[in-house]
Swiss-Prot record:
It comes from Yersinia pseudotuberculosis serotype O:3 (strain YPIII). Keywords: Cell inner membrane, Cell membrane, Glycosyltransferase, Lipid A biosynthesis, Lipid biosynthesis, Lipid metabolism, Lipopolysaccharide biosynthesis, Membrane, Transferase, Transmembrane, Transmembrane helix. It is an enzyme of class 2 (transferase). Its main location: membrane. It is a multi-pass membrane protein. HAMAP family: ArnT_transfer. One of its GO terms (biological process) is lipid A biosynthetic process. The lineage of its organism: Bacteria, Pseudomonadati, Pseudomonadota, Gammaproteobacteria, Enterobacterales. One of its GO terms (molecular function) is mannosyltransferase activity. Disulfide bonds: none annotated. This is Undecaprenyl phosphate-alpha-4-amino-4-deoxy-L-arabinose arabinosyl transferase.
Amino acid sequence: MKLLKDSGAALLALFFVLVYLLPVNSRLLWQPDETRYAEISREMLQRGDWVVPYFMDIRYFEKPVAGYWFNNISQWIFGDSNFAVRFGSIFSTALSAVLVYWLATLLWRNRSTSVLATLIYLSFLLVFGIGTYAVLDPMISLWLTAAMVSFYLTLKAENWQQKVGAYALLGVACGMGFMTKGFLALAVPVIAVLPIVIQQKRIKDLVVFGPIAIVCAVLLSLPWALAIAQREPDFWNYFFWVEHIQRFAEASAQHKSPIWYYLPILCIGVLPWLGLLPGALFKGWRERATKPELFFLLSWVVMPLLFFSVAKGKLPTYILPCMAPLSLLMAAYATDCANNIRMRALKINGVINLLFGVACALVIVVIGLGLVKDIVAYGPQENQKVWLGVLAFAGWGVTGFITLRNNARNWRWAAACPLLFILLVGYLIPQQVVDSKQPQNFIKNNFSELSSSRYVLTDSVGVAAGLAWELKRSDILMFSEKGELTYGLAYPDSQDNYISNDDFPTWLAQARKKGDVSLVVQLARNEALPAHLPSADKVNLMNRLALLWYQKTP
């Protein structure tokens, strides 16, 4: 315990290296998300075009461009590696952690509490899971965190010059957020600050100085917004109506889920600190009058959470911006409990980690040994993965037990509960999942046929992205299914990138005259190869992915 308090910064740096840097290159990329963002940035670098996103030579208007820039720079510096693909997310998470530390220092002027808040943030299961995963959510979370820190500076500004500067920073953060994921970056800060503005009677300041933030956000994003409007006039129409209105509000929204969807996600996401969640939130509400900084954090957590819960389209990644203020609330609550020797919540947290680790280890044993007839996760040759999984979660439980000893004096070590799991998770994934969701393994095993093929087709966008990334070619064709490329494939100059089921036999006969053809098909569980496909010269089936290789004909 004393070691953690005296060497907090060094241990924090060690934790970050162990969790966020060392293991990520050895983990295969997941489809569709990681393969998609890897390939988009690879093509941007190859084209030298940082304005219009293309995905396998097809226009891709689902997101603005700033998030891709992070990934572009990562690949430019670190090359073609899984680490490079994920470094944009890792770097964004690191900057968010720095902002958490800085804001904690501004709030409480206590180095120990600042280190604790940062440690809690980095050890959240949700933050780790998304922060080492190649998606754009860590980037938008960074800019939303920066926006809220900037807003806090507006509250503490002592003169009009400081207020102008703070609101300008707020505008820059919102502008970068807008260029990363769109209008969401403008809506969330407004929703989060409204209760704070009302409580602290700062409506006049918001009205007077708020336009400065708007002007700065507009000036920052305007050059790219005009450039893409000139190059692709339909971008803003598609991006606003389809990617915002339909995704979040309409009955046809993607990823529809019930209003309570985020409750279990939040509980799992804050592990290994779940025991502090109720007390931290209650403390923020109970002390809202005497400690307005706690209400600031509470509003920052609750208002975006309510907004995302009301929206029809939901994904676990959406609530990542709520984790920064939650880590600060938990740090304040835990420090208060420890200082006043009220150890009940800290003990409960230890018990939760102990039970969670034991329960997960038992589940892996039961499923891994095939004791549940209808659930087959691991094959007969994967016993090593089963026991590694047991070891990972046993480590979680044992660490939870250690935090309970001596009246929970070692409660800070809860951050180490998921450490073994994090280091081993890449080696625990069942082979059937690897072969369906991590196409790099399949591509590696079929690289000779794929790399020599004149044409490569697939019926899965995620697999197509993996093929494009691994083969370093953007001319992968879509077969039978269009998926998220439906809009881009509608452009006249992209229609040849899609081959329908009905057209495939005729197209194949002509294509084989020019070279070998590889067709990669993703199958449903226990599905046989489609009988209507022309007979291939070679077939390689690996669980749910199949390669049909057609040799060049004279």
